[in-house]
């Protein structure tokens, strides 16, 4: 069915005409009843969607399928632990036994039970409120006994005048109805105390048979206490009654020591990472520069490497070369880059001296025959016609090896030396043995080509 989209002014009246054109398709024409008002209207445009076709209830059937999604929630076994959906019209449910309402009540009860256990209250909830309050106070009384150790020690002290000012009341269970208004004052923390028996047994009276002493509150006692209150402690006259409020600071000290405040934090923090970093010297250069070690350890390391240099050079030459001449060429060539280094150790010099004497002996002579026997195999392995390039440029590279380094020599780790790095990159483009054999002729570059042509 064709669909038309129109934009018309709100509050206007239009004539909608549906017709069929020449090709049989429906044609729509919307004509305003007042064309002049249409042009001058300030009302906003309203988008309309007009579907031309038979008047059938086709869009109604797709709406019933959305109701089937509600059945899946009953299938979930963990529905009691889930929050209700925001689109649910009846979040509490209608079922009294397994609905969300019953499960939410269970969740609330369980949360309250966990909260009470976390606070130290064990057991199930008591059904009546006033009973729980009285029982909780009775349970707390034995817990506070360790706080009252100091008053018991004071009862054992022999000094009699200290006890008369302290307003301590000894009441039996028979005399408890006499002070009903006293526990209403705001100091319910003082529980029952059982003093030692040997001090109070000779002076006991009939009302104090249960041997339980209840400490009175400091503000609840009258200025003149009854005679039965002072008799269990000590026999004293009524003249010591005025000083009680002045010397009553002792019980307040007994309650303070247990809830001590936490220790104060140290004024200066312990030495940590920041303190260790202050001890380290600042690294030279920008922060991205690699760490530069002190020059003292690096000056000691090169001689050990220079001793190992020729041996490593021989090993690499033998791996790469195909004959003895190539291995010897590596051995002669490798110590040369180490000459401009900072430290030329004495053990490496005896290895360098025969090489220099070999080239010096061949320099003044025009024929290679009077030279030492070590040069014999070298002459046999020079068949190429392009040996002039390497002997001319090799000594220049060996003499000017210090400037082209990207990093200072101290930065390289002890296992890698600048000379070893250059040696490892030299043999990349070697395709023939002539290049390595000509490296030996650094001392006399102009003599070897003539021998090959002769």
Curated annotation (Swiss-Prot):
Bias (Pro residues) ranges: 59-73, 177-189, 258-269, 281-294
GO biological process, one term: symbiont-mediated perturbation of host cell cycle progression
Residue stretches of biased makeup (Low complexity): 190-203, 295-306
Superkingdom per UniProt: Viruses
Coiled-coil regions, chain positions: none
Extent of motif PXLXP motif, interaction with host ZMYND11: 350-354, 404-408
PTM text: Phosphorylated.
Keywords assigned: Activator, Host nucleus, Host-virus interaction, Inhibition of host innate immune response by virus, Inhibition of host interferon signaling pathway by virus, Interferon antiviral system evasion, Modulation of host cell cycle by virus, Modulation of host PP1 activity by virus, Phosphoprotein, Transcription, Transcription regulation, Viral immunoevasion
Skewed-composition ranges (Polar residues): 359-368
GO molecular function: protein serine/threonine phosphatase inhibitor activity
Bias type Basic residues, positions: 317-332
CC per GO annotation: host cell nuclear matrix
Location of this chain's protein in the cell: Host nucleus matrix
Role of this protein: Plays a key role in the activation of the host resting B-cell and stimulation of B-cell proliferation. Acts by up-regulating the expression of viral EBNA1-6, LMP1, LMP2A and LMP2B genes, as well as several host genes including CD21, CD23 and MYC. Activates transcription by acting as an adapter molecule that binds to cellular sequence-specific DNA-binding proteins such as host CBF1, SMARCB1 and SPI1.
Family that this chain belongs to: Belongs to the herpesviridae EBNA2 family.
Protein name, entry field: Epstein-Barr nuclear antigen 2
């Amino acid at each position: 069915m064709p669909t038309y989209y129109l934009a018309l002014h709100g509050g206007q009246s239009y004539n909608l005409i549906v017709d069929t054109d020449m090709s049989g398709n429906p044609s729509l024409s919307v004509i305003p009843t007042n064309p002049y008002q249409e042009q001058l209207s300030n009302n906003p445009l309203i988008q309309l969607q007009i579907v031309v076709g038979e008047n059938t209830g086709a869009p109604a059937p797709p709406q019933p399928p959305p109701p089937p999604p509600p059945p899946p929630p009953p299938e979930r076994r963990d529905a009691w632990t889930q929050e209700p959906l925001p689109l649910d019209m009846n979040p509490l449910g209608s079922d009294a036994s397994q609905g969300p309402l019953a499960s939410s009540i269970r969740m609330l009860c369980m949360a309250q039970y966990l909260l009470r256990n976390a606070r130290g209250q064990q057991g199930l909830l008591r059904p009546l409120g006033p009973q729980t309050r009285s029982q909780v106070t009775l349970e707390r009384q034995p817990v506070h006994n360790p706080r009252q150790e100091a008053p018991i020690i004071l009862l054992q002290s022999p000094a009699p005048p200290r006890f008369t000012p302290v307003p301590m009341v000894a009441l039996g269970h028979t005399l408890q109805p006499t002070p009903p208004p006293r526990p209403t004052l705001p100091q319910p923390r003082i529980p029952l105390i059982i003093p030692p028996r040997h001090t109070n047994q000779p002076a006991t009276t009939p009302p104090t048979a249960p041997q339980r002493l209840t400490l009175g509150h400091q503000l609840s006692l009258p200025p003149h206490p009854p005679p039965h209150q002072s008799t269990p402690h000590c026999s004293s006259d009524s003249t010591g009654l005025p000083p009680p409020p002045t010397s009553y600071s002792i019980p307040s000290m007994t309650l303070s020591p247990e809830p001590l405040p936490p220790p104060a934090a140290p004024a200066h923090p312990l030495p940590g990472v920041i303190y260790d970093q202050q001890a380290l010297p600042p690294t030279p250069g920008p922060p991205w520069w690699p760490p530069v070690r002190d020059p003292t350890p690096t000056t000691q390391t090169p001689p050990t490497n220079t001793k190992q240099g020729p041996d490593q050079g021989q090993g690499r030459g033998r791996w790469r070369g195909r004959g003895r001449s190539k291995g010897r060429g590596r051995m002669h060539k490798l110590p040369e880059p180490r000459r401009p280094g900072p430290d030329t150790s004495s053990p490496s010099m005896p290895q360098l001296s025969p090489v220099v004497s070999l080239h010096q002996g061949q320099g003044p002579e025009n024929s290679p025959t009077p030279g030492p026997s070590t040069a014999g195999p070298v002459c046999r392995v020079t068949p190429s016609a392009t040996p002039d390039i390497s002997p001319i440029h090799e000594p220049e590279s060996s003499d000017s090896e210090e400037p082209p380094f990207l990093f200072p020599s101290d930065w390289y780790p002890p296992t890698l030396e600048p000379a070893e790095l250059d040696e490892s990159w030299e043999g990349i483009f070697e395709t023939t043995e002539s290049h390595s054999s000509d490296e030996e002729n650094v001392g006399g570059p102009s003599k070897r080509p003539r021998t090959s042509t002769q």
